[in-house]
Amino acid sequence: MVRLNVKPTRMELNNLKERLTTAERGHKLLKDKRDELMRRFISLIRENNQLRKEVESYLIDNLKSFAVAKSLKNSQMVEELFSIPSKEIELFVEKENIMSVTVPRMHMNITSQNENSEYSYLSSNSEMDDVFATMNSLIYKLLRLAEVEKTCQLMADEIEKTRRRVNGLEYSIIPNLSETIHYIELKLEEAERANLVRIMKVK
């Protein structure tokens, strides 16, 4: 603890007591914020881990399906199937405030295009159809995964900032204020006793 360099007066004592009350209130609010951020962060980490497992599993299975589908078609036909995009994707990113943390909220608008493209059930096969279907459903999981991972990163940064502020108040500011208040109270008591002794001597 470090005693603050202030004059031991009643005015300073009152000021320090007000500062201590404010610091203790701020400490409680920051601790509550940190705890709530941690609760939400842990929930998001669980969702992130689950989503990542699902996405990786989907991708591995889809690559296997693609290898099988490709083996049943000649290379030129496969190239033609993927040469023209069948869908147009518009990505919208909004901002949301969670406990003073600005996080992204992502939305997609998917529209079909090139309806007359070379892709058809005649030029494709069931394996290739499964590949396309899986990739279409995977887009939403990938978007949510990106959103959750970014949110986790931003919340982790805010948790660390809040933790440092809580520790600063708990281990430095509040103890220093308390120590200084105690010191001033002792000094004022000494001054009162000395003044009382002088009065008694005069009498």
UniProtKB/Swiss-Prot annotation:
What single Pfam family name could you report for this chain, choosing any that match? ATP-synt_D
Q: Which residues form a coiled coil?
A: none
Q: Known InterPro entries for this protein?
A: V_ATPase_D
An annotated Gene Ontology molecular function:
proton-transporting ATPase activity, rotational mechanism
| Gene3D superfamilies in UniProt | 1.10.287.3240
> Which keywords has UniProt assigned to this entry?
ATP synthesis, Hydrogen ion transport, Ion transport, Transport
- Asked whether the keyword Transport is assigned, the reply is yes
Q: Which GO terms describe its biological process?
A: proton motive force-driven plasma membrane ATP synthesis
Q: Decide whether keyword Magnesium is in the record.
A: no
The source's domain of life comes to Bacteria
Q: Which NCBIfam families match?
A: PRK00373.1-5, V_ATPase_subD
- What does this chain do? Produces ATP from ADP in the presence of a proton gradient across the membrane.
Q: Give the family this protein belongs to, as stated in its UniProt record.
A: Belongs to the V-ATPase D subunit family.
| PANTHER family referenced in this protein's UniProt entry, alphabetically | V-TYPE ATP SYNTHASE SUBUNIT D
Q: What is this protein called?
A: V-type ATP synthase subunit D
Q: Provide the species name.
A: Streptococcus pneumoniae serotype 4 (strain ATCC BAA-334 / TIGR4)
